[in-house]
C-alpha cells in the first residue's frame, strides 16, 4: 500500500513538471515561427529606464504596439551609440546570434556618428557608409532582410545651430540652464550628409529604405515651434514630476512623441515592405507595464478612453495579468488582449 501511495505522489509531482516542460517547448517553437524585427541604433530608438515615472522613450520601444503578435520587435538600440561603437562593443554579434532567415533588421545611426569622440565618429561617404554596408551585408549573410533608415530630426528651430557635442548630456540639463536662443519658424537640419548616406548605401546595395528624417521633419515642421515641444523631453519646472527642475531636450522623445514617431515609421515600413501590412495593428490606446504603451496602468488607459465617451475606443493590453475593470454595460471600450495578457 505504501509503495502504491509513493508512486501516486511521485506521479502527481512529475505531471506538472511534464506539463511545464511541454508548455515551454511549445512556446519556444511558437516563437521560432514568428518574424522578428530587430532594431539597431541610438537613443532616439532605444528602450529606456521607466523607474520613478520617467517619461523618456525611444520610438523602437513603442513599435510593438503597431504590429500584431505574429511580429516580435526586439530592440537592441542603445543610448549614445554610433554605427562604429555599436559594432565594436559586440552588440551586433548578439543580434546575429538571434537572427533567423526572414527576420528584419532596422539599421538607423547618425546622431552619434557625427560626434567628435574617436570611439564614435565616422564620416559620411567613407567610414559611415562602410559600417552601414557591413550591417547590410552580414544581415543578408544570415538570411535576414536589412532595412536602412536615416536618423530622425532634432527639434531645431533655432536661428543658428546650438553647439552640441553629446546628446546624452541633455538628460542632465535643466530648464533654467537650457539653450536660450531665438527660434524661427523653419526647422533647420543638423545632420547634413549623415541623413543622405543611408539612402546612398540603400541605392547601391538595393536595400529597403525608410526616410525617417523626412517623415519626422514634416511632422515637427507641421506642428510648429510650440506644439513640437510636446513630442520631446521639454518641460518647464514643476510641469513633470520625474524632472522637477524641467528640461529642454530637443533630441529625445517622451511617451507621446515616441508613439507618434513609431506610428509614422510603422506605416512607412508597411509601405516599403507590403508583406508587413497584414501584421499592422491598429488600437487607440495601449497599456503595458514595461513602458511600451501609452500608459502603464489600466486605470490611466480607461480614464483616457472615457474622455472619448461617445466614440468607440480599443485598448490593447501587452502581456501580464490584469484585474478586469468594472465598466458600464454600454461602455465605449473594447479590450484586445495581446499574447500573454490575461484577466485575473
Give the positions of each predicted feature:
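N-terminal secretory signal peptides that target proteins for export/translocation
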Residues: 1-9
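Bacterial Sec-dependent signal peptides at the C-terminal "C-region" and cleavage site
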Residues: 10-16, 20-34
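N-terminal post-signal-peptidase region of extra-cytosolic proteins
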Residues: 56, 83-94, 319-320
Amino acid at each position: 500500500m505504501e509503495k502504491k501511495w509513493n508512486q501516486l505522489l511521485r506521479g502527481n509531482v512529475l505531471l506538472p513538471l511534464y506539463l511545464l516542460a511541454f508548455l515551454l517547448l511549445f512556446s519556444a517553437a511558437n516563437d521560432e515561427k514568428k518574424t522578428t524585427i530587430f532594431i539597431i541604433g541610438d537613443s532616439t530608438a532605444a528602450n529606456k529606464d521607466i523607474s520613478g515615472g520617467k517619461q523618456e522613450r525611444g520610438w523602437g520601444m513603442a513599435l510593438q504596439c503597431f504590429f500584431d503578435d505574429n511580429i516580435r520587435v526586439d530592440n537592441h538600440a542603445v543610448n549614445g551609440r554610433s554605427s562604429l561603437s555599436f559594432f565594436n562593443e559586440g552588440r551586433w554579434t548578439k543580434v546575429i546570434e538571434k537572427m533567423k532567415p526572414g527576420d528584419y533588421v532596422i539599421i538607423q545611426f547618425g546622431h552619434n556618428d557625427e560626434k567628435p569622440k574617436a570611439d564614435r565618429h565616422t564620416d559620411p561617404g567613407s567610414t559611415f557608409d562602410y559600417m552601414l554596408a557591413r550591417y547590410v551585408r552580414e544581415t543578408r549573410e544570415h538570411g535576414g532582410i536589412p532595412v536602412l533608415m536615416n536618423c530622425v530630426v532634432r527639434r531645431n528651430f533655432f536661428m543658428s545651430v546650438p553647439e552640441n557635442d553629446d546628446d546624452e548630456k541633455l538628460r542632465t540639463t535643466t530648464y533654467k540652464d537650457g539653450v536660450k536662443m531665438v527660434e524661427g519658424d523653419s526647422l533647420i537640419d543638423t545632420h547634413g550628409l549623415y541623413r543622405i548616406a543611408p539612402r546612398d548605401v540603400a541605392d547601391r546595395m538595393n536595400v529597403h529604405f525608410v526616410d525617417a528624417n523626412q517623415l519626422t521633419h514634416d511632422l515637427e515642421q507641421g506642428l510648429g515651434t510650440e506644439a513640437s515641444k510636446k513630442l520631446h523631453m521639454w518641460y518647464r519646472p514643476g510641469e513633470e514630476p520625474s524632472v522637477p527642475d524641467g528640461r529642454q531636450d530637443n533630441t529625445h522623445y517622451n511617451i507621446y512623441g515616441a508613439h507618434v514617431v513609431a506610428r509614422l515609421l510603422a506605416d512607412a515600413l508597411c509601405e516599403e515592405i507590403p508583406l508587413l501590412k497584414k501584421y499592422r495593428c491598429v488600437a487607440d490606446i495601449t497599456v503595458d507595464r514595461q513602458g511600451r504603451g501609452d500608459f502603464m496602468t489600466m486605470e490611466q488607459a480607461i480614464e483616457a478612453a472615457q474622455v472619448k465617451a461617445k466614440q468607440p475606443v480599443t485598448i490593447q493590453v501587452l502581456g501580464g495579468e490584469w484585474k478586469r475593470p468594472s465598466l458600464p454595460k454600454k461602455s465605449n471600450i473594447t479590450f484586445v488582449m495581446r499574447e500573454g495578457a490575461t484577466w485575473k
